[in-house]
């Protein structure tokens, strides 16, 4: 059974129970592999200072490699909100460009994200919508 690292993209203000419930649903739905889930807030805490800016961190989520290998550190980007902020929108856009699978859980339904749409707002926290 392969182990797949999954980046959990969530809003900064999502509560831990909401995030955990989404991870449990993912595990139940996609049980053929072993998964290691890394919350966005943990990756951000571990890497942002070293990388120096948001753009570098967003790219590192998608293009960064596992230590000592050429394998990307995340095989799946898992989004738990359809409406997202700028950082998640950028991560998803990089992932789509790189061919990394992006999975969305929205109202209990899983789908594969195909695009990111900018909404008619200047809200950096909720100004983009994921399209399946």
Where are the language model's segments positioned?
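Conserved catalytic or regulatory cores that recognize and/or transform ribose-phosphate-containing ligands
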Residues: 1-132
